[in-house]
């Protein structure tokens, strides 16, 4: 009798379905003790239980290897050596924490971040958050546009501005090919990206950076030299992207999760393991790129030709860093991998934009139309800068876009931290006190750096530019109120009390379920044992690698 009660307690009750809450009750209330979903899962080997959850983390991690990351890594290494490696370490640790929180939020609530923002905030606030999220998607697409244009320039000697125009068609072609085998296409793209990573690993073993310098850069925070703060913010912006939080919280909804509290907890743990492995690989790649760039460009015996390239190191000219490994074919292989990096990151950006629009506005667009809209907007500044400033101007635009992403981060991060720590949103799955303290501390540290750089950088520029005094006054009148609005918006999101309830206790909120419990009614053994459904069937068509 006691063992029967223990078995019944082991089968937790899942929340009942309510509107968009996508929870399906699976109550075991028969007189017998049928096998519950967790018992069914325990019959599987551990790796077989883990494999169905593989996919979202790796797809999201492609954003950590996009042209924006490559550009900021290359310039950080060329300008500051190993000094900013600690930014990569902290940034990816923070990325792992918040990406796992985004996954937990989706699994536990059955809704993704954009949908929860719509349910929580007043009309004008959620419209503002939607616009900021769309700006983040566009800012993230700018490095992909420029990186693809550089790759086409290297491969076919097409002018950068013409390559920018051609990027509007390249990704549309890639999206069109998905129907012929998305998993094969993603495998090809990932293979090309990791080929470039392998090249940098090989170059790393050739140039042999000093281990003491690398370790010092990783574990001793330091910001010295001209532009170090700006480069650090650009690194953070390239690593921790706002649209990735919306993307990850939605991608996990395409997975089938057992209808039990334990099943939800296991899913969250599996998504954490998958994200941790994917981000660890991304961490090694980013560290190797900075180390190679720093070692080559700061070498005492650097040739005059390489010294000129290091002085203005861009994505276009970075292939010389791989000559020791690839020889004469370095530029071609580098360009192909750069092209793959830009295209794969753009596909993830397209999905993120779809989820943002669907969540905030209940509006869905076809993938090709969504991509074309975003790409056309991103092409405009890229085209203008590439015509006026050439390759160096386009590279500076990548850094600016990464900084914009860093400044945009609080408007996705703060809602995520609040929702994932909220009992009305998450119920028993909310963050522990340790995660709350760590995540908010790191979040406010990044926000503080952004505000400090925004204020000091603008004031420094305002006092040292060559504009007439009247022009400075007009610019100050426009910019200072915007800075105040930025800070006030962060304060509002931080201290506003959440009101919307998304977690539903099945027994307390459904009198019928409680009555069924009292009457001994419940599902059949077969339904109980195999009661698996996608949390979100409307999102289950997202093409993820198996």
UniProtKB/Swiss-Prot annotation:
Glycans are attached at residue 371. It is found in: Membrane. Keywords: Glycoprotein, Ion transport, Membrane, Transmembrane, Transmembrane helix, Transport. GO terms for cellular component: plasma membrane. GO terms for molecular function: cadmium ion transmembrane transporter activity; manganese ion transmembrane transporter activity. GO terms for biological process: iron ion transmembrane transport; manganese ion transport. Belongs to the NRAMP (TC 2.A.55) family. NCBIfam families: nramp (TIGR01197), Nramp_1 (NF037982), PRK00701.1 (NF001923). Probable divalent metal transporter. This is Metal transporter Nramp6.2. It comes from Populus trichocarpa (Western balsam poplar). The gene is NRAMP6.2.
């Amino acid at each position: 009798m006691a063992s029967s009660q223990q078995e019944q307690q082991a089968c937790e009750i899942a929340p009942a379905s309510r509107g968009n809450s996508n929870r399906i009750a699976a109550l075991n209330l028969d007189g017998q003790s049928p096998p519950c979903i967790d018992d069914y899962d325990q019959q599987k080997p551990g790796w077989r239980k883990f494999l169905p959850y593989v996919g979202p983390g790796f797809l999201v991690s492609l954003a950590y290897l996009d042209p924006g990351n490559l550009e900021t890594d290359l310039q950080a290494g060329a300008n500051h050596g190993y000094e900013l490696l600690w930014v990569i370490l902290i940034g990816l640790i923070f990325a792992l924490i918040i990406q796992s929180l985004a996954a937990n939020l989706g699994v536990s609530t059955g809704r993704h971040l954009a949908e929860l923002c719509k349910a929580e905030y007043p009309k004008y606030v959620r419209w503002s958050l939607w616009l900021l999220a769309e700006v983040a998607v566009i800012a993230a697409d700018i490095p992909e546009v420029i990186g693809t244009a550089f790759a086409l320039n290297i491969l076919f000697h097409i002018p950068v501005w013409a390559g920018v125009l051609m990027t509007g068609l390249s990704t549309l072609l890639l999206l069109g090919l998905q129907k012929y085998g998305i998993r094969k296409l993603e495998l090809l793209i990932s293979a090309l990206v990791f080929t470039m990573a392998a090249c940098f690993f090989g170059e790393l073993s050739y140039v042999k950076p000093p281990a003491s310098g690398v370790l010092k850069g990783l574990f001793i925070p330091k910001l010295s030299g001209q532009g170090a703060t700006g480069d650090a913010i650009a690194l953070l912006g390239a690593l921790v992207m706002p649209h990735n939080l919306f993307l990850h919280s939605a991608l996990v909804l395409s997975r089938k999760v057992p209808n039990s509290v334990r099943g939800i907890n296991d899913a969250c743990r599996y998504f954490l393991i998958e994200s941790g492995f994917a981000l660890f690989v991304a961490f090694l790649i980013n560290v190797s790129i900075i180390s190679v760039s720093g070692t080559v460009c700061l070498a005492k015996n650097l040739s005059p030709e390489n010294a000129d390239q290091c002085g203005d190191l861009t994505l276009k000219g970075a292939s010389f860093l791989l000559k020791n490994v690839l020889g004469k074919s370095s530029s071609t292989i580098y360009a192909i991998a750069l092209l793959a990096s830009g295209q794969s990151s753009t596909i993830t950006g397209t999905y993120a934009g779809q989820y943002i629009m669907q969540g905030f506005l209940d509006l869905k667009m076809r993938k090709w139309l969504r991509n074309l809209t975003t790409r056309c907007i991103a092409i405009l500044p890229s085209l203008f800068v590439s015509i006026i400033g050439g390759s160096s101007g386009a590279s500076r635009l990548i850094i600016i876009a990464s900084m914009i992403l860093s400044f945009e981060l609080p408007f996705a991060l703060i809602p995520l931290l609040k929702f994932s720590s909220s009992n009305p949103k998450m119920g028993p799955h909310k963050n522990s006190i340790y995660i709350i303290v760590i995540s908010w501390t790191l979040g406010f540290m990044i926000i503080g750096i952004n505000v400090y750089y925004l204020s000091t950088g603008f004031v420094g520029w305002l006092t040292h530019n060559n504009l007439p005094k009247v022009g400075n006054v007009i610019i100050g009148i426009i910019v200072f109120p915007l800075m105040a609005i930025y800070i006030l918006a962060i304060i509002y999101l931080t201290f506003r009390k959440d009101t919307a309830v998304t977690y539903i206790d099945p027994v307390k909120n459904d009198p019928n379920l409680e009555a069924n419990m009292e009457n001994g009614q419940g599902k059949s053994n077969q339904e109980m044992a195999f009661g698996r459904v996608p949390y979100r069937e409307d999102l289950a068509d997202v093409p993820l690698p198996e």
